[in-house]
Amino acid sequence: MYVAIEGVDTCGKSTQIQLLKAYYPQAVFTKEPGGSIIGEHIRDLVLFAPKKYGFTLDERAELMLFLADRAQHYAQVLLPHKDKLIISDRSVISGIAYAKSIDIAQSIALNDFVLRGMLPDLVVILELDEKSLKERIESKSHDNIESRGISYMLEIQKCFKNVVTQMNLKYIVLDATQDKERICAQIREHINILV
């Protein structure tokens, strides 16, 4: 079973991944981008290109880099562990949502090509209201994506639901302002139903 934890930056995805590790020690935990060796380099390039390398990526170049990472992630992580519980910090859903200026049908087709049809069995979307998102974003330094602003992040948050609906995937939306243990319990409840 393949579970994707989704949400905008600062919503608590990484926190939930850490909490879930205690409950599912046999599971394979991964992340996108960066779940493979090449993915770490791609992630660094996309997130820090303006500050570290002095240029901004074209949106199509960014999409293609994420697709390359996703293809490698499929080959190195998803396919070899397809019979195990896989829990991922982000997935194809983020890839499509963040490429919102690209036609969604085209983006879905490109991602389906690199994933060979292997999609999450459950997508957990951690959602923040504008006030909470603003507070969390202001309390940390920004990478290239986060520096696009609150309005951009809220648009992306809406895109997550649109993407899972378009792809006909099973998903739940959880209020990310709740206590982290409560959120973890809700995620576990849904995983345990499907495992």
Swiss-Prot record:
GO terms for molecular function: ATP binding; dTMP kinase activity. The keyword Magnesium does not apply. One of its GO terms (biological process) is dTTP biosynthetic process. InterPro entries: P-loop_NTPase, Thymidylate_kin-like_dom, Thymidylate_kinase. CDD domains: TMPK. It catalyses: dTMP + ATP = dTDP + ADP. GO terms for cellular component: cytosol. ATP binds at residues 7-14. Its EC number is 2.7.4.9. Keywords: ATP-binding, Kinase, Nucleotide biosynthesis, Nucleotide-binding, Transferase. It holds the Pfam family Thymidylate_kin. Phosphorylation of dTMP to form dTDP in both de novo and salvage pathways of dTTP synthesis. Belongs to the thymidylate kinase family. NCBIfam families: DTMP_kinase. This is Thymidylate kinase. It comes from Helicobacter hepaticus (strain ATCC 51449 / 3B1). The gene is tmk.
